[in-house]
């Protein structure tokens, strides 16, 4: 019989493993398997549902544990091999777009199903391992260990992400915890193989907090006419930028090569000089999304006295400082800020002659958009207004964006957003045959002269007769890339049915003795659903303050778990006969969060604003977790209650996508309704309990 301390430690370790692996596969698969960007929350939902399924099927015998371990290691090897060799397997460029060849779409669908199956096997085994230990402790103690392990998992990945640690370290940590749980030599063997493969495959890559960055020499044709130090940057296996000598960049137009890199450099560098052409008086320049420094080099070449370069990715800044032929980021006239563009605008007080929206999407999200819910708070009405507040009396702002088509819905959204922020139509052009849009606004913006239009190959936008039907983007609806592709919807629905709906139905209607009443199951389910909705809303609120970064998401997850742990500790101190007053606090905190408006400028002290915003965002989570802990304290079956809650969290991960249609603030209203259903289930359960107690008493007598 294991001591309580050993059981507590094992629950902690499994909980660490579940959350760490969940975050790890979300980030890693998103980098390597391109099509997964089109399916928001799919990995998280599969992980939660499979863990919940495992909780209801605890492994009893030691042989069963061995079989689980072998099956899990096989699934782990398949998953890791698919990720590491996504290039040769053509998973890196997979797509489910209707205009792609049918074999490619079929391959993508098969790959998604295979990866989903591997994830299901892995997380179900972790759920079984957790179930084997969970019922050995009192509910409140077991849940405390679960929360502490989850907190440690979130904190661990947050730290290694910020330190730009490569994946072989991730795998080594996972292998070490698995060995602690199983004490089997083949766990070490499989870990060593996976670590070695990862170290070999990623030997030349940088893992930033946001993406995988690879630096290669520019194509030979570029090197021949530009500079021998010119380079190409790849983000998540796709070319997205490069560093060229801007004094010789005109020569690349003579190259006939149609490679992705050459075409991309022609389109990108062809419009870089446009902002300077539109604002000849540009002593002070701000560049949002400065990348490796090309925009900065053009601004300095054009006579800028000082340039503030804002770039969120520290690795891209490092590459620019070390490798760019013009050395713009190390020029004494340049100040580099490694932070989110929206966060910089909030706290900066400086005014500029020229503000440039440069490359702000190094992940090439738009190239894989199908059913995409990507929050982008830089291209919103509120953000554009913030830029206007940073312009001098004759200042100009330019927004340059590249998409595959002149009639792209993205062009329309960007145009309508700037129009809504300025109160009048902006000056807009398309360039390079329609693949790039240039939007100018601000008090000093004026239409281009015919000479400038001819020199930069500009055409007025929108074309005559074109109707712009797309909505403007706001902080409540910041979905620049959202495109409801019918094929993507069908594929997503099929994946959800196979990976989520079927397992949930099997769990709900199984005849296993789960020792939980229907009202209690409903309480746990709806509390989990509401929890996920409020976690999503919290991430969004804090993204407006600090930027939509991995660090923000990790910090929110960490704080949510800490709040849940605090609520759990409070629930363990005494017996609460009624939770009505806690529901009242939950309702009030939801209402306050809905009506509270974050200040648009950084007049308040950053730490004070951070504390207030975090408290308002996470307070509903505290009350919801408090209710959960009180109910869980009296659970008749730890694993049954936790399983129901995880199913609710998983379905919440799907339900949160309603905000694509109704806005992010609507999640608070939806959460209020969901928590109301939890309260109704609790009241029904309270009415039924006296009847159950009477029946038990009569049987015993």
Located regions from the model:
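Alpha-helical transmembrane segments of multi-pass membrane proteins
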Residues: 1-701
């Amino acid at each position: 019989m294991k001591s309580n301390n050993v059981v507590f430690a094992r629950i902690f370790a499994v909980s660490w493993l579940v959350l760490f692996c969940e975050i790890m596969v979300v980030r890693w698969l998103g980098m390597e398997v391109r099509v997964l960007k089109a399916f928001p929350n799919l990995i998280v939902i599969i992980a939660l549902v499979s863990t919940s399924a495992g909780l209801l099927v605890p492994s009893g015998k030691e042989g069963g544990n061995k079989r689980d371990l072998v099956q899990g290691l096989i699934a782990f090897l398949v998953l890791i091999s698919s990720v590491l060799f996504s290039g040769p397997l053509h998973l890196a460029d997979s797509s489910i777009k209707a205009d792609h060849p049918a074999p490619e779409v079929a391959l993508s669908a098969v790959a998604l199903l295979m990866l989903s199956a591997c994830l299901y096997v892995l997380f179900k085994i972790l759920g079984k391992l957790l179930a084997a230990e969970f019922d050995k402790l009192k509910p409140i103690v077991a849940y405390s260990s679960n929360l502490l392990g989850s907190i440690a998992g979130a904190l661990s990945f947050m730290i290694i992400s910020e330190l730009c640690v490569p994946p072989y370290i991730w795998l080594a940590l996972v292998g070490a915890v698995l060995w602690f749980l199983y004490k089997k030599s083949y766990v070490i063997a499989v870990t060593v193989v996976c670590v070695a493969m990862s170290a070999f495959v990623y030997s030349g890559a940088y893992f930033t907090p946001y993406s995988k960055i690879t630096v290669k020499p520019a194509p030979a044709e570029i090197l021949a006419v530009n500079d021998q130090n010119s380079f190409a940057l790849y983000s998540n296996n796709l070319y997205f930028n490069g560093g060229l000598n801007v004094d010789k960049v005109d020569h690349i137009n003579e190259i006939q090569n149609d490679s992705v890199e050459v075409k991309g450099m022609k389109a990108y560098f062809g419009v870089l000089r446009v902002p300077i052409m539109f604002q000849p008086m540009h002593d002070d320049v701000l560049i949002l999304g400065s990348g490796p420094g090309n925009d900065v080099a053009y601004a300095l070449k054009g006579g800028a006295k000082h340039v503030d370069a804002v770039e969120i990715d520290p690795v891209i800044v490092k590459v620019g400082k070390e490798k760019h032929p013009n050395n713009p980021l190390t020029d004494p006239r340049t100040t580099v800020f490694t932070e989110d563009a929206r966060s910089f605008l909030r706290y900066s007080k400086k005014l500029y002659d020229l503000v440039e929206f440069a490359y702000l999407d190094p992940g090439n999200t738009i190239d894989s958009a199908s059913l995409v819910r990507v929050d982008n708070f830089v291209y919103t009405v509120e953000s554009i207004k913030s830029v206007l507040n940073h312009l001098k009396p004759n200042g100009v702002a330019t927004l340059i964006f590249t998409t595959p088509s002149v009639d792209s819905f993205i062009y329309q959204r960007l145009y309508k957003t700037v129009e809504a922020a300025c109160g009048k139509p902006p000056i807009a052009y398309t360039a390079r045959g329609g693949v790039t849009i240039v939007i100018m606004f601000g008090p000093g913006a004026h239409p281009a002269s015919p000479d400038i239009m001819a020199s930069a190959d500009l055409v007025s936008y929108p074309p005559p007769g074109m109707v712009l039907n797309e909505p403007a983007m706001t902080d409540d609806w910041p979905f620049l890339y959202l495109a409801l592709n019918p094929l993507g919807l069908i594929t997503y629905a099929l994946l959800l049915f196979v990976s989520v709906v079927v397992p949930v139905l099997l769990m709900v209607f199984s005849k296993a003795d789960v020792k939980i009443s229907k009202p209690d199951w409903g309480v746990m389910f709806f509390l989990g659903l509401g929890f996920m909705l409020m976690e999503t809303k919290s991430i969004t609120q804090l993204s407006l303050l600090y930027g939509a970064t991995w660090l923000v998401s990790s910090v929110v997850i960490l704080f949510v778990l800490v709040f849940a742990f605090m609520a759990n500790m409070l629930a363990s101190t005494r017996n609460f006969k009624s939770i009505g007053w806690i529901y009242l606090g939950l309702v009030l905190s939801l209402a306050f969060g809905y009506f509270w408006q974050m200040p648009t400028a950084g007049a308040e002290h950053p730490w004070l604003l951070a504390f207030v915003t975090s408290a308002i965002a996470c307070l509903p989570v505290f009350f919801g977790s408090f209710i959960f802990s009180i109910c869980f304290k009296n659970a008749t079956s730890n694993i049954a209650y936790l399983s129901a809650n995880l199913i609710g969290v998983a379905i919440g991960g799907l339900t949160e996508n309603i905000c694509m249609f109704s806005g992010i603030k609507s999640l608070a209203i939806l959460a209020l309704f969901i928590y109301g259903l939890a309260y109704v289930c609790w009241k029904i359960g309270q009415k039924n309990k006296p009847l159950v107690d009477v029946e038990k008493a009569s049987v015993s007598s």
